[in-house]
Curated annotation (Swiss-Prot):
The protein's assembly and partners: Homotetramer.
Residues where alpha-D-glucose 1-phosphate binds: Y102, G167, E182, K183, S200
Gene3D superfamilies: Hexapeptide repeat proteins, Spore Coat Polysaccharide Biosynthesis Protein SpsA, Chain A
Metabolic or biological pathway, per its Swiss-Prot or TrEMBL entry: Glycan biosynthesis; glycogen biosynthesis
Protein name per Swiss-Prot or TrEMBL: Glucose-1-phosphate adenylyltransferase
Top-level taxonomic group: Bacteria
Species annotation: Deinococcus geothermalis (strain DSM 11300 / CIP 105573 / AG-3a)
Keyword ATP-binding: yes
One MF annotation (Gene Ontology) recorded for this entry: glucose-1-phosphate adenylyltransferase activity
Length: 413
């Protein structure tokens, strides 16, 4: 009999390092790739893996995310175990504290244990909603069952110099976890490879009994911790639970012959920009065109992209770029850029290495270079952005350490 698997996506992250893109939306709701939201990749991983029972746990500035899920992610009304349901923080009442919001990743799940009970889950897959990657959850689940584990953690080998930003594991020769350290200042390396650490991707599969016991112990019982990485996983090891690591690099993706190496935490503006620019390269690391691993999102009703004018010096043209529906390149040039829905660039404008969100308009003779423009911005004719950072800062734009300029949503010139 096929096990009952419940998917839970943690989508309440604030994403403060992505400001100003997260001033009015949560991190999982940030647009990516011209037509997607960051959360779409976690949802697609579940659906492409045959997990159709999904709860999305939301908290911080969730309206944009709520509208996206409700508009674009719906199953038929007659399929009982096929659902994608939003679960906002509902001020769960603790006897000693009164009503509280989600206080951490583990607390978000703890406050919704009744959903797991009602579903009668055998296994619970708890995944982060703010990373860019593909993952065959079914393969990870099979590894979890084969190992007879209580908890399985998706693991990503990473250079030790960067591992301090993540949870780090030590494992034995069978990949059973022997130690878990959350964001250690001096991450341990792997045996035989001291320059590489085994980091947690923030994706877990729990056997239901172990999950319920650990959450009750960590949150409502003897413990005082509300986070999986800081509290629940170290507690699981201390209490003798079988905690297994799962090698993400061995995760098979249908239609992809190369090893599965791509996983990005686009938690900073520079990381977000770098991941975006990968998509427009000739051979991107992250392939969004694999028909055997479709990437669904909210349906768009925009007309096809359009290029107009062909006079010399005024040709509507784009090179090495992604253009969503409704885009009009009207006598301007676009290079190495991502243009989201209903963007319009006017004659003699030049857009280079940029990410433009929905409903951005670029005026005549304007020049943009290495710029992220949030939605609903009208850029006047002759405007230059990204070419003089002092001028950009004077307008109130964010300029990153790598020189990426960010224009906030609905900015008025």
């Amino acid at each position: 009999m096929k096990p009952r698997v419940l998917g839970m996506i943690l989508a309440g992250g604030q994403g403060s390092r992505l400001a100003p893109l997260t001033l009015k939306r949560s991190k999982p709701a940030v647009p990516f790739g011209g037509k997607y939201r960051i959360i779409d990749f976690a949802i697609n991983n579940f659906i492409n893996s045959g997990v159709f029972s999904i709860y999305v746990l939301t908290q911080y500035k969730a309206q944009s995310l709520t509208e996206h899920i409700q508009r674009g992610w719906r199953f038929g009304t007659f399929l009982q175990d096929y659902f994608i349901t939003l679960v906002p923080a509902q001020m769960y009442r603790y006897e000693e504290l009164g009503a509280v919001w989600y206080r951490g990743t583990a607390d978000a799940v703890y406050q919704n244990l009744h959903l797991i009970d009602n579903f009668n889950a055998d296994y619970v897959a708890i995944f982060s909603g703010d990373h860019i990657y593909k993952m065959n959850v079914e393969h990870m689940l099979q590894a979890h069952m084969d190992a007879r584990a209580d908890v399985t953690i998706a693991a990503y080998p990473m250079p030790r110099t960067r591992a301090h930003q993540f949870g780090v594991m030590q494992v034995d020769d069978r990949w059973r976890v022997t130690e878990f350290l959350e964001k250690p200042q001096d991450p341990p390396g792997l045996p035989g490879d001291p320059d590489t650490s085994l980091t947690s991707m923030g994706n877990y599969i729990f056997s239901r009994r172990a999950l319920e016991e650990l959450l009750h112990t960590s949150i409502s019982g003897e413990g005082e911790g509300f986070d999986f990485g800081h509290n629940v996983l170290p507690r699981a090891l201390a209490d003798g639970y079988h905690v297994q690591a799962y090698d993400f690099h061995r995760n098979p993706i249908p239609g992809q012959s190369s090893p599965n190496l791509y996983w990005r935490d686009v938690g900073t503006l520079d990381a977000y920009f770098e991941a975006s620019m990968d998509l427009v390269s000739v051979n991107p690391e992250f392939d969004i065109y694999n028909p055997q691993w479709p990437l669904r999102t909210s349906s768009e009703f925009s007309p096809p992209a359009k290029f107009v004018h062909e006079a010399e010096g005024r040709k509507g043209q784009a090179f090495n770029s992604l253009l969503a529906g409704g885009v009009i390149i009207s006598g301007g040039t676009v290079r190495d850029s991502i243009l989201s829905r209903n963007v319009r660039t006017h004659s003699y404008s030049l857009v280079e290495s940029c990410v433009l969100f929905d409903n951005v308009e670029v005026g005549r003779h304007s020049h943009l270079r290495r710029v992220i423009v949030d939605k609903d911005v009208i850029i006047p004719p002759g405007t230059r952005i990204g070419l003089d950072h002092e001028e950009d800062r004077g307008r109130g734009f964010t300029v990153t350490n790598n020189g990426i300029v960010v224009v906030p949503k609905s900015y008025t010139f």
